[in-house]
């Protein structure tokens, strides 16, 4: 994923302008080599009028991050003009210079010190680096904050659908629409279960046949499953896909039981797996079961950060001796998460004994885990990292074995003592720092599932 950054060098002409230009050029090259798209003024920002001109250009071209490159000392009028022109997060970058006993040629550090003071007075958030232009650590910091800025911007226009209400007794799936809208800017659309059922019953047989043929190339045993409920699951996939497209929804939270079993005679799990994976779609539509809207929103966040599908799962076992946690959901995981060394299968729901669910072990690799939790009555972000292990799946359906950064016992203690929800979401890759930065941007408290502190 390429992030769009406003690169804004600040230069006071009373300092060493040639050296400042050299440092600016090196920093620019470093950012471009890292894959960032840079938006910058034709000339460095040298005074308040040029800062105001640059601010107008930024306001007309939304970006994920403002990088203020303090090429020399400058007063705070310029940084404030730039900060107030954009809602993008701020990153201040100062460069060290040798202690030569001679002229202080740039005085960059004092510049960001003054900038930080002014930004704090005016309640602007920021992060910073004090390092040479080609220091590799600065790229990691900038990438994390740009990802956070991009995520915040995209969520403000996100739309999520809730199909039905969560089952009685599953308070962990409670919808607090005002809280989600106020914190993230997302819009919620409510959808009646009967609309899904009516659409599913009216999907043309030829459409279902075509989808079945495509799915046969991914799952090797569909012909061995009971065919009527299998076709029912595929019709649910198309019904939900149509609704998401027509209502411009980025994700769905679906009351998956008991009505899909009792009214349609099939499982919704396989349909939601296909949607979450982007099967036959322009982009994945993350789906959570039990109408868990916070789970869907968490999955969408992980999907947009990783540019890959996310999965909402139960935590169903802890092996303290082996330091392992078992993750499982009926058959909901995206097919792209299947272990590449094992053929995924179509399966039947473990309790209702109806298709279609997915049946495969999760592939090995590093994962980021997250949950938008409201266990305390207000939102916070539960966040951790770990590794899915190349081990046999602990249960039928879509399942895997996880080793966390903290011990399995510590995780169990956190899960139960904090009264956390029974669902957590994951995606492959490390997006921990980006999520920490995102939480900081929106003042969202973080509960870490890790020994590490930041």
Give the residues covered by each predicted segment:
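Cap/lid and interdomain-hinge subdomains that line or gate substrate/regulatory clefts
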Residues: 1-5, 39, 98-225
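N-terminal basic/disordered segments at the start of proteins
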Residues: 1-32
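Short, well-structured alpha-helical segments in soluble
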Residues: 51-63, 237-246
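C-terminal catalytic subdomain
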Residues: 277-396
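Extended hydrophobic packing segments that form well-structured cores
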Residues: 351-454
């Amino acid at each position: 994923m390429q992030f769009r950054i406003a690169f804004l060098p600040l230069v006071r002409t009373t300092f060493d302008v040639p050296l400042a230009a050299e440092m600016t050029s090196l920093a620019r090259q470093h950012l471009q080599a890292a894959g960032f798209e840079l938006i910058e003024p034709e000339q460095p920002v040298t005074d308040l009028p040029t800062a105001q001109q640059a601010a107008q250009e930024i306001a007309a071209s939304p970006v994920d991050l403002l990088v203020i490159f303090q090429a020399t000392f400058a007063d705070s009028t310029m940084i404030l003009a730039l900060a107030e022109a954009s809602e993008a997060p701020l990153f201040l970058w100062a460069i060290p210079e040798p202690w030569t006993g001679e002229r202080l040629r740039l005085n960059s550090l004092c510049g960001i010190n003054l900038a930080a003071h002014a930004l704090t007075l005016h309640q602007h958030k920021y992060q910073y680096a004090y390092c040479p232009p080609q220091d590799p650590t600065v790229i990691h910091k900038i990438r994390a904050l740009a990802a956070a800025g991009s995520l915040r911007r995209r969520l403000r226009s996100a739309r999520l659908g809730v199909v039905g209400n969560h089952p009685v007794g599953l308070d962990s799936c409670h919808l607090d629409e005002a809280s989600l809208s106020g914190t993230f800017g997302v819009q919620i659309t409510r959808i009646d279960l009967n609309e899904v059922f009516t659409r599913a019953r009216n999907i043309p047989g030829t459409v279902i046949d075509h989808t079945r043929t495509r799915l046969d190339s991914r799952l090797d045993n569909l012909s061995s499953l009971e065919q009527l409920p299998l076709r029912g699951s595929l019709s649910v996939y198309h019904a939900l896909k149509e609704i998401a497209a027509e209502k411009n929804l980025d994700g769905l939270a679906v009351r998956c039981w008991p009505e899909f079993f009792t009214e349609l005679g099939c499982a919704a799990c396989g349909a939601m797996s296909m949607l979450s994976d982007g099967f036959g779609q322009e982009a994945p539509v993350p789906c959570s079961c039990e109408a868990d809207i916070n789970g869907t929103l968490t999955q969408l966040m992980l999907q947009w950060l990783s540019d890959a599908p996310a999965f909402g799962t139960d935590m169903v076992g802890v092996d303290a001796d082996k330091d392992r946690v078992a993750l499982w959901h009926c058959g909901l995981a995206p097919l792209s998460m299947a272990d590449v060394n094992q053929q995924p299968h179509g399966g039947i729901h473990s309790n209702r004994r109806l298709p279609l669910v997915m049946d495969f072990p999760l592939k090995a690799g590093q994962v980021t885990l997250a949950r938008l939790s409201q266990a305390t009555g207000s939102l916070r972000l539960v966040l951790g990292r770990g590794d899915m292990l190349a081990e046999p799946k602990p249960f039928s359906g879509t399942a895997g074995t996880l080793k966390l950064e903290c011990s399995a016992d510590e995780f169990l203690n956190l899960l139960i003592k904090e009264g956390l929800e029974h669902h957590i979401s994951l995606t492959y890759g490390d997006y921990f720092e980006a999520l920490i930065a995102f939480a900081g941007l929106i003042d969202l408290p973080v509960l870490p599932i890790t020994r590490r502190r930041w």
